[in-house]
Amino acid sequence: MHKNMREMEQYSDDQFVVKGVYKGTRSEAVLLFLKPGQEMPPHPHERFEVTLVPHKGRGTMTVNDTKEVELVPETLYYEPAGSTFRIRNTGDGPLQVLITLVRVGE
């Protein structure tokens, strides 16, 4: 399977957009699209390890309401299961992030 990320690109003036890339038995991948100023609110990933790879734009990720990380293109970010995070587009242009989630345990 392969998908062209450019062809999947989609933004909304109302809120962030999440598009599924694939879903397996223990893992899945999504693309997150945010216009400047938009954010994905804090949400937990109790049973998933999360890897993020920004492809376009700049933003911040707040982890567990304590750590703020700058998101920059072509950098890999990993958060263990149980983390809660928020993503915000702080740049002047669109932010696009590939997110993979891997289920841990049963």
Q: Predicted regions: what is each one?
A:
Residues 1-28, 41-42, 62, 77:
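A short, N-terminal "cap"/entry segment at the start of jelly-roll beta-barrel domains
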Residues 25-26, 66, 92-93:
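Short strand-connecting beta-turns/loops that link adjacent beta-strands
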Residues 30-45:
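Conserved short histidine dyad/triad with adjacent acidic residue
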Residues 31, 51, 67-68:
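Short, surface-exposed secondary-structure edge patches
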Residues 44-46, 90-91:
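Short glycine/proline-enriched turns and hinge-like loops at secondary-structure junctions
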Residues 48-59, 64:
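Glycine- and acidic-residue-biased ligand/ion/polar-headgroup-sensing regions
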Residues 66-81:
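Short acidic-glycine-tyrosine-enriched beta hairpin
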Residues 81-106:
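Ligand-binding loop in jelly-roll beta-barrel domains
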